[in-house]
Swiss-Prot record:
PANTHER family, A to Z: ACETYLORNITHINE DEACETYLASE, ARGE_DAPE-RELATED DEACYLASE
Any one GO molecular function term: hydrolase activity
A Pfam family recorded for this sequence: Peptidase_M20
Enzyme class, first EC level, given as a word: hydrolase
InterPro entries linked to this entry: ArgE/DapE (IPR010182), Bact_exopeptidase_dim_dom (IPR036264), Peptidase_M20 (IPR002933), Peptidase_M20_dimer (IPR011650), Peptidase_M20A (IPR050072)
Annotated source species: Methanococcus maripaludis (strain DSM 14266 / JCM 13030 / NBRC 101832 / S2 / LL)
Entry annotation: catalytic residues: 90, 155 (proton acceptor)
Protein name, per record: Uncharacterized metallohydrolase MMP1398
Residues annotated for Zn(2+) 2 binding in this entry: 121, 156, 392
Cofactor(s) listed in the protein's UniProt record: Zn(2+); Co(2+)
Residues annotated as binding Zn(2+) 1: 88, 121, 185
Record keywords, A-Z: Cobalt, Hydrolase, Metal-binding, Zinc
NCBIfam families: DapE-ArgE, PRK13983.1
Amino acid sequence: MKSILDETIELSSDLISINSVNPTFGGIGEKEKSIYIKNKLEEYNKNYSIKNCEITEYNTVDSEGIERPNIVSKYDFGKNDTLTIISHMDIVPEGDLGLWNSDPFKAEIKDGIIYGRGSEDNHKGIVSSFLLLKMIFEEKIDPKYNLNLIFVADEEDGSKYGLSYLVNNFEDEIFSSKDLIIVPDFGMPEGEFIEIAEKNILWLKFKITGKQCHGSVPENGINADLIAFSFGKGLYDKLYGKYDGINPIFNPAFSTFEPTILKNNIENINTIPGYVELNFDCRIIPKYDPKEVLSDIENYIEVFKNEIEKHILHFDISEKENISITYEILKLEKAEETKKDSEVVKKLGSAIKNVLNKESVLCGMGGGTVAAFLREKGYNTAVWGIGDETAHQPNEHIKIENLIKMAEVYLDILK
C-alpha cells in the first residue's frame, strides 16, 4: 500500500488534472471527475476487501443536455448513526493564465504545498474523504458511526443539479435526522473555525428601460445609464440604512448590498443607451427576511420612478411613463443556523482539540455552501476544513499536510 503522503499527492494531482469547470462558466462539467472518483472508490473496495459499501449514482441532466453526476458511497458499520461528509466536484474557471505561476490543470508541488485549480475548492474535501477510508481500513478500527461520502455537482452555480437535486428528490434515501454532517468547503489556516451559519443570499438583476438617442441630444431620449447610476446608489443607501443590524458571528458582521455587474446595449460612445442591466449581490444576516427586502425594493422602484426628475436633468418628458425598472431573482437562498450545541458541532470541536490542539471557534460567513440546503431542511450541518483561503484565486493551493490533518480529524470523530 502507498504511504499516506504518496496517496495524498497522487489523489490531489489526479484531481487537478481533470478539468471539471461548471458548465455555466463555459466548462464541460463534472462527468470525467465523477468517473475517476467512482473508479477510485471501487479500487479501495477491492484493495481493502470492503464488503459493506454501497455506491449509488444520482445523475441528472441540465438545461443544456449535459449530464450532471452525483455519487453517494455508504459504508455500513452496523451502527445507528452516520457521519456524512459532502464534497463538490465542480470547479470555477482558471481565469487569467497570466496570473498563474504554473499550469492550473497540472499539479505543482513546492515546499509541501500543492498548486492547481480546485486544490482547495473543493479537492480538499474529496482527498480527505479518501484518506479517511485509507485510515479506517489500514488501522482496522471499529467506527462509532456508519459513514456516507457524498460527491456532488454544481455547487459553484447554486447546486440545482447537485445537493439541491438530491435533497429535493432523494432526501429519505440518503439522509437521516441523526446524521452528523460535515461540509469541508471552508477553512482557515489553523483549522479551528467551524462555520455554523451563512447569510441569506439574494442575487438580483435589474432591467432598466429608457429611450435610446444620439449623445448630442439627451432631451430626445432617456438615459438608462443615468437611471441605473442613480437608482443603484439610492437603493444601496436605502438597504444599508434600514438593514443595519449586527451579528458578530459573521465577518463582516453586517448585511451587504453591493452592485456588481453593469452593462448596457450600446458599443459606441456617441449613443445614449436605452437599456441597462444592473446586478446586486445581497448577503443578509439571518435576522432579516429576504422577502421583506424584496418588498422594500419594489416600493423603492415606484418612488424612484415618480421622482425621476430629481435624477436626470435632460430627458424626453413625454416618454416618462415608458420608463421601466423590473428585476429578476437570480438566486435566493434562505439561511438557517446550525445549533451551537448540536452533536456534530460538539464532536467536531472535540476532534479539533484532540488532533490539532486548538480550541474550536464558531463562526458564520457571507459565502454560500451546500450546507444551506440541509439546514433549511432541519439538518444540523457543520462547514469546516483547513486551508489558506486561496479558493477561486490564481495559484490556488493547499498544504499537503493539511489534507492529512483533515482526515485525521474525521477519524477522531469515528473512534
